[in-house]
């Protein structure tokens, strides 16, 4: 058994990531555009989406996903989608955003803190990546920069549980 090593950051402590060859995903849900200043409003998007979880036509599994895409650096902004995996897009509500996540290699980080500390974990990951010897996978407008996976162990009431951050990397 390999011992887990902790990597310290001023923002958050990270466990060493595991590496996965992720399958292609179709994600559908609600999305909005955010900036560094407005990203603190993402929980309101989740509150709007929460009643749909388990009720989306064609939903696959019980996990929910937070997908970051269309990132711009000047000025910093990004689209964020709160959604679920679906088998196809044909029956999802018209107000839902749809995004295809390609099959690719990922560095997968566990987030064990309260969900409100996820921005600190993301900042720590983005500081860790350039020093890791890994390179982020190329991305386009509709290709996710990363996604958060909220598994069955995530508790919506407490904001704690099964949360992972999946960062696409070059294989």
Q: Over which residues does each language-model region extend?
A:
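A solvent-exposed interaction/effector surface
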Residues: 1-171
């Amino acid at each position: 058994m390999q011992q887990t090593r902790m990597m310290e950051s001023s923002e958050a402590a990270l466990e060493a990531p595991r590496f996965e060859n992720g399958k292609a995903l179709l994600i559908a849900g609600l999305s909005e555009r955010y900036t560094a200043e407005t990203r603190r409003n993402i929980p309101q998007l989740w509150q709007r989406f929460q009643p749909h979880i388990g009720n989306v036509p064609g939903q696959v599994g019980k996990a929910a996903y937070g997908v970051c895409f269309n990132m711009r650096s000047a000025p910093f902004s990004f689209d964020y989608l709160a959604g679920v995996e679906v088998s196809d897009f044909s029956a999802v509500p018209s107000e839902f955003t749809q995004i295809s996540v390609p099959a690719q290699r990922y560095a997968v980080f566990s987030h064990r803190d309260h969900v409100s500390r996820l921005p600190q974990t993301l900042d720590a990951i983005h500081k860790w990546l350039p020093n890791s010897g890994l390179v982020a996978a190329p991305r386009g407008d509709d290709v996710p920069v990363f996604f958060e996976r909220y598994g069955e162990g995530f508790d919506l009431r407490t904001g704690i549980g099964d949360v992972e951050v999946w960062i696409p990397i070059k294989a």
